[in-house]
Amino acid sequence: DELTRVMQKTMPSKRLEQIRDVFVFSCFTGLAYCDARALTREHIITGSNNRPWLRTHRQKTSTPVDVPLLDVPLQILAKYEGCSGNDRLLPIPANQKCNDYLKEIAAICGIEKRLTFHLARHTFATTVTLTNGVPIESVSKMLGHRSLKTTQIYAKIVNDKLAEDMTNLSTRLQHLAM
């Protein structure tokens, strides 16, 4: 899929590699651009499972957010440890610059979809969590949504994709009909 392509593609420059890594980090944490950019060491805590978690507040809504860190974001954090003199965890430039670089990354990876930082949050909700069986209530909490209704928009997208996939499968399996 597209996320795997972005993750596995060798980038032609350090700058694009950093933006790719930050984008992937958000795909696996669900953090919005401004929340990811604001992360410092203090935002990493030991969660109830004795593993590292992110604890922050969504700048947009002031909602508290706790996200258990999977291996991919942990590897990215380790890669950029001490990357900036200002205590930030990740080397994230201005949002417009990020989105310009993401456009380049999409072209390099042969992705026609418009890559933006917000798409990373959407990818976390759909591709990373909901399609892998994470309950919608947990996804909603990690995204910092105040209402489950907001998260249900993502669940509808997943269901629409599921319906499309099953229609395609049905077409391919028609020759097996009894």
Task: Name each model-derived stretch.
Residues 24, 28, 34, 104, ...:
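C-terminal catalytic core of tyrosine-transesterase DNA break-rejoin enzymes
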